[in-house]
Structure formats: C-alpha cells, structure tokens
C-alpha cells in the first residue's frame, strides 16, 4: 500500500494512542508462566502482539477474550505443551527472543521461524548465553539466525554481562533463569527497559536489583509465580509520532492521554524537550506498577540541534529515526552516535533514514553508529521507501505533514505491526 501525506495547517485535539507493545508482549509471555489466572486490560491488538498471543496458544496456554479483556490461565513454569508445528514468529523479535528463553527450559522439542526480515535479525546474542546455561539451540549460521530448533534441557543459572543493554536479551535470560537451577544475574552498562523485572516482581518472583555504576538484576529459579491484573498504558513509542507533529506544525497543540513515562522508555520526550520542545507531563499517576501521564505538546518554533550519545540510546532506541526527522527542523547540527543497534532492527534504520532524507534533499551524513543531521531545512517532498518498517513509515508520514509538495510512503501498511489505526488517528487530529 502507498500512502500520500500532504502538508497541513495545524493539528489539535486529544488522543489515546494504542497500548504499549512491550508490556502487551510481556503480559502474555510472563503470565503464561504463572500458577493461576491473570487479567489483562487494554491489550494491544497489532501484528506483533497478536503473534505472541497465537504462539502461546499453540504452546497450550488458555487465552480467552471477554468484552475486550484477556484472561490468561497460566500453566506454571514447565506446563507448556510441545507445539505440533513450527512456531511462526512473524516479524516479532520480542516474541522470538523471549520465547527462546522460555523454550530452552521446557521438556520438549520446538522449532521457530519468522518472515523475511526476522530471519535476517541476529539471534546469537540470545542463543549464545542461553547455551551457556545448558540450552540446546541450533539453526542457520551456527544457530545465529532463524529458523532455530530448541530441544528443552536442564538449565543452570549464570552471570552475564549484557554489553548492548538489550531488554530482549535481559528478558530472555531472566525467563530462562526462572526455569534454571540456582541464580541468574544480568548486568548492563545502562539500564534497558525494565518491564520484565517490574512484572515478575509483581508476580512474586525472587528478584533483586542493584543500581551502582551499572545496573544488575538477579533472579532465582523454580519459584511459583502468581497471576496478576495488568492494565496496559498507552505506548510512548506510538505517542512520540504525534508529539513530533505537534512540535513541528504551527498553531498545533495536542494532549496525549494515559502515556507510559517509565524513565527507561521516555527518552524521546526528554530529548525533544532539550531541543526546545514545549512538552509537559500532567496528571502523573501509577498504573500496573508503571508511571503514566497525560502529555501536553504544542508547536515549538525554536528547536535546536542536540547530541545523542550511547547512554541515551536504550531509553529511545525505537524513536531515534523519528528524532532524526525532527532534527531536520532544528537549528544547527544534531549528532547521533552509539546507535549501531538500529542497523539490526526491522530494517537497517540508520541506512533507511539517511537514504530517505537524502532523497528528499536533506543534508545528512551517515556514521557507522548513527548520523549527523544539518538543520534547519525545507522539505520539498518526494517518495519514501519504508523498507516495510513500521517506524520508518510513520516517521516519514510526520515529515510529510510539513512538506511543500507531499511525501508518498511505500509499503505504508507496515504500520499494522505496532499501530494499525495510525492513519485513522492522524486524520482525526488533522480534521480537528
């Protein structure tokens, strides 16, 4: 599907973007390990999260939807059933990596595959430490790429240094640690998103966190988990697109409701404010052990270029392409480094952003681990290749709103991965 986005005069209104993708994934995966029933409200129904739901049903977990609420009957730590067929992970790296941790400690054989994009994404970063726990994982390129096979085995706890500060790696090892003998400790230089730790703590896991110069989390194996109730807040990664639009378009103001503001996730909003964005957190509260706010954003004509460093990346890794797009409208240079992780997302997001910006006439320099964007620049318009990557499609759709001649997005239907209603919601705030 191609989508043409034209210049608009302003956006206004209130919006509750879809629920958080990370928490929605974990609400299925982690509660399936519980001894008892869990209730999940406001579960995100999008491509990736529906993949998780379908995979866990195939593993024998009862997941029933009643009036928009999910009821998940946990099967305990090792009550999963051997799947009758290969598990299709679609486009979801989160589903794949966390499920590898879970399957490694079961008592059966399983096989996993995914779509063209997912089969090129690195799985060795999870498979290798799982193997050091005793997991039997094999597959393409010495077990580093899907398809992968997993033969469940007895696991032993390890100490692992998560040098990339990857939440998916950390979560996979913590899940495997639940199934292992002894303790598993994961240390990372900068804290990555911590929803897994928060949820496991709420479920009664024996989990301990240390915060010194680095961040460590230790979990003990074999303790029963309790079912819980989860009300999933709105996704800050989805809200970020509309916040960017409000900041860039004259006479705009927007209230984004019920947004997760966990400090491991709200880096985009903090950096946008540092650039000069008029952003305020209001009605701050707690929901399912997570901080939530309504975010007020309005047009901000005096944006300045900033520096994004390696330590900034974990809290905004999915929003860096969007921040790069905003940076085209900021005075001076915006320099992004330490973001090499973007090269192994749904697309090579550094390459995707740089090539598309250049094709639109924007002055940008590609770095091995980031980019340098020169501002402030006029956006004439043109054609954008989304590389079938939802975040590239949505990010350049926002740039289209300030383009002189409009921007045509190729494969715009990729937004279904995380935000099926994206264009519908965009029309709503434009019509206001």
UniProtKB/Swiss-Prot annotation:
PROSITE patterns: EPSP_SYNTHASE_1 (PS00104), EPSP_SYNTHASE_2 (PS00885). GO terms for molecular function: 3-phosphoshikimate 1-carboxyvinyltransferase activity. Its EC number is 2.5.1.19. It comes from the Bacteria. Pathway: Metabolic intermediate biosynthesis; chorismate biosynthesis; chorismate from D-erythrose 4-phosphate and phosphoenolpyruvate: step 6/7. It is an enzyme of class 2 (transferase). It catalyses: 3-phosphoshikimate + phosphoenolpyruvate = 5-O-(1-carboxyvinyl)-3-phosphoshikimate + phosphate. 3-phosphoshikimate binds at residues 21-22, 26, 166, 168, 318, 345. GO terms for biological process: amino acid biosynthetic process; aromatic amino acid family biosynthetic process; chorismate biosynthetic process. The keyword Kinase does not apply. Its main location: cytoplasm. Pfam families: EPSP_synthase. One of its GO terms (cellular component) is cytoplasm. Keywords: Amino-acid biosynthesis, Aromatic amino acid biosynthesis, Cytoplasm, Transferase. InterPro entries: Enolpyruvate_Tfrase_dom (IPR001986), Enolpyruvate_Tfrase_sf (IPR036968), EPSP_synthase (IPR006264), EPSP_synthase_CS (IPR023193), RNA3'P_cycl/enolpyr_Trfase_a/b (IPR013792). The active site is at 318 (proton acceptor). It is found in: Cytoplasm. The keyword Aminoacyl-tRNA synthetase does not apply. Phosphoenolpyruvate binds at residues 21, 93, 121, 168, 349, 391. Monomer. Catalyzes the transfer of the enolpyruvyl moiety of phosphoenolpyruvate (PEP) to the 5-hydroxyl of shikimate-3-phosphate (S3P) to produce enolpyruvyl shikimate-3-phosphate and inorganic phosphate. HAMAP family: EPSP_synth. PANTHER family: AROM/DEHYDROQUINATE SYNTHASE (PTHR21090), PENTAFUNCTIONAL AROM POLYPEPTIDE (PTHR21090:SF5). This is 3-phosphoshikimate 1-carboxyvinyltransferase. It comes from Persephonella marina (strain DSM 14350 / EX-H1). The lineage of its organism: Bacteria, Pseudomonadati, Aquificota, Aquificia, Aquificales. The gene is aroA.
């Amino acid at each position: 599907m191609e989508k043409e986005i034209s210049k608009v005069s302003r956006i206004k209104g209130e919006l509750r973007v879809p629920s958080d993708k990370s928490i929605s994934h974990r609400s299925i995966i982690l509660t399936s390990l519980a001894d008892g029933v869990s209730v999940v409200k406001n579960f995100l129904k999008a491509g990736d999260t529906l993949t998780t739901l379908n995979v866990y049903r195939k593993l024998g977990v009862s997941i029933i939807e009643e009036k928009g609420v999910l009821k998940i009957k946990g099967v305990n730590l090792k009550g999963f059933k051997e799947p009758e067929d290969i598990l299709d992970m679609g486009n979801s790296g989160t589903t794949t990596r966390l499920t590898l941790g879970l399957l490694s400690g079961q008592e059966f054989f399983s096989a996993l595959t995914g779509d063209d994009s997912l089969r090129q994404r690195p799985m060795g970063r999870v498979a290798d430490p799982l193997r050091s726990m005793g997991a039997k994982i094999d597959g393409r390129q010495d077990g580093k790429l899907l398809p992968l096979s997993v033969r469940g085995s007895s696991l032993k706890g390890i100490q692992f240094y998560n040098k990339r500060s990857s939440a998916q790696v950390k979560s996979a090892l913590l899940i495997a640690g639940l199934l292992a003998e002894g303790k598993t400790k994961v240390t990372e230089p900068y804290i990555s998103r911590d929803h897994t730790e928060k949820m496991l703590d709420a479920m009664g896991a024996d989990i301990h966190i240390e915060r010194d110069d680095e961040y460590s989390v230790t979990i003990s194996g074999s303790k029963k988990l309790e079912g819980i109730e989860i009300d999933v807040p709105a996704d800050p990664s989805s809200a970020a697109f509309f916040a960017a639009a409000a900041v860039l378009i004259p006479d705009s103001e927007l209230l984004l409701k019920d947004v997760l503001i966990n400090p491991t996730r709200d880096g985009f909003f903090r950096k946008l404010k540092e650039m000069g964005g008029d952003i305020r957190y209001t009605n701050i509260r707690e929901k399912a052990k997570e901080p939530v706010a309504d975010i007020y954003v309005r047009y901000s004509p005096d944006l300045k270029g900033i520096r994004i460093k390696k330590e900034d990346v974990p809290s905004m890794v999915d929003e860096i392409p969007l921040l790069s797009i905003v940076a085209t409208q900021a005075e001076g240079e915006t320099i992004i480094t330490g973001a090499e992780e973007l090269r192994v997302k749904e697309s090579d997001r550094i390459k995707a952003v740089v090539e598309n910006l250049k094709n639109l006439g924007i002055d940008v320099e590609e770095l091995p681990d980031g980019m340098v964007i020169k501002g402030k620049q006029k956006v004439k318009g043109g054609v954008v290749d989304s590389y079938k990557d939802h975040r590239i499609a949505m990010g350049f759709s926002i740039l289209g709103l300030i383009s002189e001649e409009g921007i045509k997005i190729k494969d715009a239907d990729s937004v279904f991965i995380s935000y099926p209603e994206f264009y519908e919601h965009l029309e709503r705030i434009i019509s206001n």
